[in-house]
Design a protein with these regions (language model features):
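C-terminal regulatory domains involved in ligand/effector binding and gene-expression control
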Residues: 1-80
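Signal for well-folded cores of large energy- and translation-related assemblies
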Residues: 47, 89-94, 120, 124-127
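Conserved interaction-surface patches within small, structured recognition/assembly domains
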Residues: 73-109
Length: 127
């Protein structure tokens, strides 16, 4: 009988990053996860810590090969929040990892390029 050992990269603990863009504040939290249900529990707690935030966008990657993923923009324009977060996770070849980002709106619209940059940078700082 042969046994294979799968190897993958993940985060070993929880970490945070804060990014400010104009007057908006983006707080990102990265954390290890075993499954989607665990991600939902952790992300919900994170969101509850920031009840005044305008959005909580996220992405997660699961599976030894990182073949299961999800990204969510939570009301931001399509593709401007969840996908940049997912790209940051993928850029490090991580799996069994989730990143959630809350945004405190500062009164100035950032536009699609600004949102893409800000959510991606917040995720990078957390990872």
């Amino acid at each position: 009988m042969t046994m294979s050992i799968e190897r993958y990269r993940t985060v070993t603990g929880t970490s945070e990053g804060i990014h400010r863009e104009l007057a908006s504040k983006f707080i990102a939290r990265a954390f290890p996860i075993a499954n989607e249900a665990e991600f939902k529990r952790i992300a919900e707690r994170f969101g509850n810590e920031h009840p005044a935030s305008r959005h909580m966008c996220y992405a997660w990657v699961l599976g030894d090969a990182g073949d299961h993923h999800r990204a969510n923009d939570d009301g931001e324009p399509s593709g401007t929040a969840g996908l940049p977060i997912l790209r940051r996770i993928r850029s490090l070849d991580l799996t069994f990892c989730g990143v959630a980002v809350v945004r405190y709106f500062g009164g100035t619209l950032l536009g699609k390029p600004g949102l893409i940059q800000a959510y991606g940078e917040a995720a990078r700082l957390a990872l």
